[in-house]
Structure formats: structure tokens, C-alpha cells
Amino acid sequence: MIIIFLNIICWIVAFICIYILLNPKTKILKNINLSPFKRRIFEKTENVDEIFKTGEKNIKKMSKKFNNNFDVMILNFNGSLNVGNIMRLSCIFGVNTFHIIGRKFYDARSCVGSDKYINIKVNKEIIKEMPDKSIIPKIDYNLFLKYLEEENLSPIFIEQGGESIINFNFNELNSLKRKSVFIFGNETNGIDKRLIRCCKKVEGFRILSIPQFGFLKSLNVSNCASIILWEHYKSNEKRKVI
């Protein structure tokens, strides 16, 4: 009976210790030097809602600390849902700045709050919208090159006919003097081929492609972005995690 009683006491003490360690209110784990991965395992019991109660400004500051030093650019998108989906993906994977080129507005509802936590730049001058929506908008190539220079960006075009992401080492982008910007084109027309040719001499210029194993003309641009950003994240030796 004494042995059984002692076993029960030991189990109770063990449960109390575990509760104290895992309870975010005790903050004991905050002072322990754990690797980011182990810290995430210990702290995953925390209530995410409590983090968001700290306010938008604080969350944006946290996002900046954990950005993975890459930008994303969308060119002349038509659909707000695609804008929002890619913005959310960019936020999740630690984007530095999200560039919207050639679109005067987007539906903030499709972003589900991600537009509050990342840097967003909208440029309405590079691509001129035409009165007739069936006509492909004109791109000012010189303004585009100037924009890349001013923002210190290396263009990584995501388009068919480029280097397969299967063979590409995303860690090469870490050695560039400029920030890498993944560029996604219009849902229907893709990226202007002449624009790509104009950027060939820009440092870090690349065209990356997602290999296709089935017979279809193209892949949805949001799905395309999710594949590219995930491949970049998982291959990046300098990636940061929360």
C-alpha cells in the first residue's frame, strides 16, 4: 500500500511540474535557452489570440524581425482573390515587401488581415491601364528598371521556359547584393517577354519555372506562388522561424 501511495504522489508531482512548465502564464520557459524548433514545440500550447491582442503595430514589428529577406511582386493582376491569396502566402513565409504593380486597388477582405502586418508598395505608373480591358496594358520598361534600381531588387521571374525549380539552389539568392524579388505575372497573359529581356542585365536576373507533368496550358498563379515560396523557404539555409 505504501508503494502504491508513493507512486500516486510521484505522478501528481510530475503532472504539477509539467503544468507549471507548459503554462504560458508562468513564463518559466521564456528564460530557458532553447533552439527555435524546441521553443516552438514547448510554446505551441499558447493561445494565438493572446498574441494578436497586443495590437497591429506590435505584430508588424514582430513580422519585420522574422522576415526572410525576399520580396514578392505581382504585375497587373485582374483578380482580387489572387492578390489576397499571394499576399497571405507572402506574409506567412516572411516577406520583406509586397509590391503591387499596375493595379489601382485590391479587395482588402481577400487578404484576411495580412495587409496590416507586412510592407506593401503600390506603383500605378509602370503599367498603364487601357480604356478597353481586352487590350493588354502597356508597360513602361524604363520605369520598371528604375523601380528595380531604387528598391535594390534582383528580378526572379516566375514564368514558363525558365530554369526548373527542381534543379535550382535557392541558397544562391543569399549571396546577391540586392534583395531577391519573386515576380508573378497577369493571370491570363503571364509576364511580358520584352520586359523579361529588358531585365537580363540586372544583377541576379533569373527565370524560374515549375515543371509540368500533365498536359495543361498553365497553373493558377496563386498555386504557383505557394509552390515557389515554399520551395524557397524550405531550401533557404538562412530562413527564420517564429
Segments predicted by a language model, with ranges:
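Short, glycine/charged-enriched secondary-structure capping and boundary segments
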Residues: 86-88, 113-115, 170-173, 196-200, ...
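RNA substrate-binding interface of SAM-dependent RNA methyltransferases
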Residues: 34-37, 42-162, 226
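Short glycine-/acidic-enriched loop or helix-start segments at secondary-structure transitions
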Residues: 83-84, 109-110, 166-169, 192-195, ...
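Short, charged, surface-exposed secondary-structure boundary motifs
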Residues: 129-133, 167-168, 215-221
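Loop/turn elements at beta-strand to alpha-helix junctions within RNA-recognition modules
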Residues: 8-9, 79-80, 187
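Active-site/ligand-binding-proximal alpha/beta "capping" segment
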Residues: 157-213
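Terminal signal-anchor or tail-anchor transmembrane helices
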Residues: 2-27
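Structured adenosyl-cofactor binding patch, chiefly the S-adenosyl-L-methionine
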Residues: 35, 196-242
